């Protein structure tokens, strides 16, 4: 099974450059605006899109992404509407991978079999479910793989050599290395330590290693890109969108332009880093 994720990373490896993975919250600040943001991301330089699934109790998310999820839920966003966003995006873009990221509860309530059927039909390529450990692979991971959807695991600085094989087992698409302990949006880890961690993980898997949590600026993204197959940026994009909203979370400026300006700058830095290193 070759997915869009596999194809994208193979293309980028051939080009000798890392990927830029961009996260935003589905439905933030409203469905229409969020869909416009999603459609604009690839043109701005995003190689992979992480589409957040809003949830009322996001334990791993920092204040910015928690607020984005709350805005989306208050605007009426549901899992069905998040899948609708993927389907609408696919009408215009059949190559950029979509990874849905969030928590298991909304999927469980929706119904696992129904969710996987609808996700596949909507053009979703991968899942990151942060609160579903490998011991629960039978719940969603294995059914997702059978449905042709990659299941992407998180590893952290505390994932030891005994735990790592369990995390990597049944993983596909890429491995998401959380660069520090804590919630999204916290301070970035020392890039040298990130490089050591990436090299260590690569001894156990051929999957691309993507590094995220704490990457906010083009300079930070470039530093991480020297070590990893991909850089993941989320909180900074969510903050760019939030900066164009009023105190009630309604659009007052241009969230699409704000998000795409940032993504363009991130993409240029990430791409230039590897090109400079190759010279």
UniProtKB/Swiss-Prot annotation:
Keyword Phosphoprotein among record annotations: no
Active-site residues, Swiss-Prot/TrEMBL: 50, 61
Pathway stated in the Swiss-Prot or TrEMBL entry: Amino-acid biosynthesis; L-tryptophan biosynthesis; L-tryptophan from chorismate: step 5/5
Enzyme type, top EC level: lyase
PROSITE patterns for this protein: TRP_SYNTHASE_ALPHA (PS00167)
EC number: 4.2.1.20
Amino-acid biosynthesis is among the record's keywords: yes
SUPFAM superfamilies per record: Ribulose-phoshate binding barrel (SSF51366)
One cellular component term from this protein's GO annotations in UniProt: cytosol
Function: The alpha subunit is responsible for the aldol cleavage of indoleglycerol phosphate to indole and glyceraldehyde 3-phosphate.
Subunit-level organization: Tetramer of two alpha and two beta chains.
HAMAP family xref list: Trp_synth_alpha
Alphabetized NCBIfam families for the sequence: trpA (TIGR00262)
The protein's name in its UniProt record: Tryptophan synthase alpha chain
Species of origin: Brucella abortus (strain 2308)
Gene this protein is translated from: trpA
């Amino acid at each position: 099974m070759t997915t869009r994720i596999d194809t994208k990373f193979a293309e980028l490896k051939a080009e000798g450059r890392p990927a830029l993975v961009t996260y935003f919250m589905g439905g933030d600040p409203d469905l229409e605006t969020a869909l416009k943001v999603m459609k604009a991301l690839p043109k701005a330089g995003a190689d992979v899109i992480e589409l957040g699934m809003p949830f009322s109790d996001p334990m791993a998310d920092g204040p910015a992404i928690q607020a984005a999820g709350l805005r989306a839920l208050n605007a009426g966003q549901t899992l069905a509407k998040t899948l609708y966003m993927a389907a609408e995006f696919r009408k215009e873009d059949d190559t950029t991978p979509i990874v849905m990221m969030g928590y298991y509860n909304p999927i469980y309530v929706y119904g696992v079999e129904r969710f996987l059927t609808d996700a596949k039909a909507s053009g979703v390529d991968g899942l990151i479910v942060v609160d579903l450990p490998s011991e629960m692979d039978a719940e969603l991971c294995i059914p997702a793989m059978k449905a042709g959807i990659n299941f992407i695991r998180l590893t952290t600085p505390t994932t030891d050599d005994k735990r790592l094989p369990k995390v990597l087992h049944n993983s596909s698409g890429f491995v998401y290395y959380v660069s520090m302990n804590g919630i999204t949006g916290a301070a970035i880890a020392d890039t040298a330590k990130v490089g050591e961690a990436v090299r260590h993980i690569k001894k156990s898997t051929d999957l691309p290693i993507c590094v995220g949590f704490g990457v906010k600026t083009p300079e930070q993204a470039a530093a991480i890109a020297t070590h990893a197959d991909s850089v993941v940026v989320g909180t900074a994009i969510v903050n760019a969108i939030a900066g164009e909203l009023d105190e009630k979370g309604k659009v007052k400026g241009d969230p699409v332009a704000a998000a795409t300006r940032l993504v363009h700058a991130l993409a240029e830095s990430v791409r230039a880093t590897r090109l400079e290193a190759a010279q």
